[in-house]
Amino acid sequence: MKRKDIKRQIRKQLKYKHPHWKNMRKSAKKKLLREIADEVMNNYDCSQLMNVPLEELIGIESQVPTAGIRTLKEMAKYIENFHNDNLFILDSNRQFKDKLFDPELKFIDSLFDNAIINTLLAPTGYSPAHREVHPYQLFRMELLKAIKYPEISYRKFCTDEYFGQERQQNRAFVGLPPDTDDQIDHTELCHFRLGLSFRQIMNMMVYALHHFYQSGCLENAIIHGVDSSELPMETNYPLCTIKVNGKNVRIYTDPDCDCGKRRSKRDKSSYVIGYRMHTLTAINPSTGHSFPLLSIVGAANHHDSLFLTPLIKLAQSMGIEMKLITADQAYHDGDGEILKETGVHVIAPPSEKVNLPENVQEFPLRVTCNEHCNIPMKFIGKSSTGHEFACNAESCECMFETDCIKFRTIPSDSGYFQPMPTFLNQSEQAIKIRKHIERPFNLMKKREGLEQTRVRSQHGVIVRSAVTTIATLVLEMAGTRRKQSRKQDKQMDLFAAAG
């Protein structure tokens, strides 16, 4: 944690005391970073106790619940009353609707209300009468790129090739006049992303989630899951490296990113420089389909378990109700702190690093009272001290019946005895369904193009991940890219009839 605190202080000085340092030459950046790092190291007292919030240590202090983020219920009421307060409903994009032929774009155009998007994303002092380009147009451009053109750069996207007179459908979807050559420059999109606050991003997410919950893609009984995926940045070497307790602290061109480890992959390095996206998903138990709901973006070097509590709190502030989360071993809640703080059970596969308690057999799992007893005990519940087991022997079955206490408590751990024990049927089913969590990551990174972030800051990655999540949700709602069930082979029917 000391290394995280030192990196936090360096990052804070760069952002607030030198806001224009990104425009400096590389040699000047290195010199400035070395001066700041030396100053922080000389003034840092390792013996002093840290009183820094976890969110600041892991670099997500800008992604915490803030005032102004609406819940799902508040958003539903806001949408219901929005047009009731207006005498006339004017749709400036109505004249372009006959240009839309793509079923996906037609569905999205009918789903999102431009006036509501303007109120959610408009900057302070926004005046529609004095604007040629409105927030809803810029948001639609981001959405169009994620859905139709994820593989190209922003600079190429904002050209005649995609918004010229021959591209009437794209112009109609964004809201550009069909009879002019007016276009939106890529720098306007860049300024739009930089100008969005976290409150605006989350309110737009809540707006999309409101429509998603109304679409019927999920049932009443759902299980939530959490997993992470790396988002590499276009940087290879640190500008400055310092030693803290024998370990390196690296500062890159983007001070918020860092070097972390990832799972072994055949065609990729085991290390990645960039960010890691921690995503909350909703799983439909009857179909096994999972959908992304919300993400937090942090540096790749931090352990996954540090992001689980902030992610749950952010989801709860948006009105997402959770009871059970299934995740991998990196998100263990062995001490039960997450359950106490958020009221959400976290279930993960048992960790191989945790030793079994005394007098516990692993395969099949059974608990006995002591080393002399061979009769399995029954699980009766959980208390503040741990998991409680009682004797399950019949009368006169146990030879130690008169001297045995017939009761045992096993503390919680990250193995089989988690706050929600893994030997329960519900836990086993939740662990089995965890494999479906990987599907949204494959869609967001491969289909919607998030694997190449094409932005150069943490804030840009946050906006890109939010837009990509919304794009994934609307495509699932549209249902245009679902695989059709394979038709049965007629030759097999012939063989069955021949019998």
Locate predicted features.
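Amphipathic alpha-helical segments in structured regions that serve as interaction surfaces
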Residues: R3-W21, A28-C46, P53-E56, I60-E61
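Dynamic "connector" segments at or just before major functional cores
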Residues: K4, I58, V64-L138, E142-P150, ...
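Short alpha-helical "recognition helix" segments of helix-turn-helix
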Residues: C46-S47, F157
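Short, positively charged, Gly/Tyr-enriched micro-motifs
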Residues: H130-M205, E219, H459
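Polybasic low-complexity intrinsically disordered regions
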Residues: T159, C190-L339
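Short amphipathic alpha-helical "interface-anchor" segments enriched in bulky aromatics
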Residues: E161-Y162, Q329, V360-K382, P411-Q458
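An internal, acidic/charged active-site-proximal segment
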Residues: G298, H302-S395, P421
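Basic, amphipathic alpha-helical segments enriched in Lys/Arg and hydrophobic/aromatic residues
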Residues: S427-G499
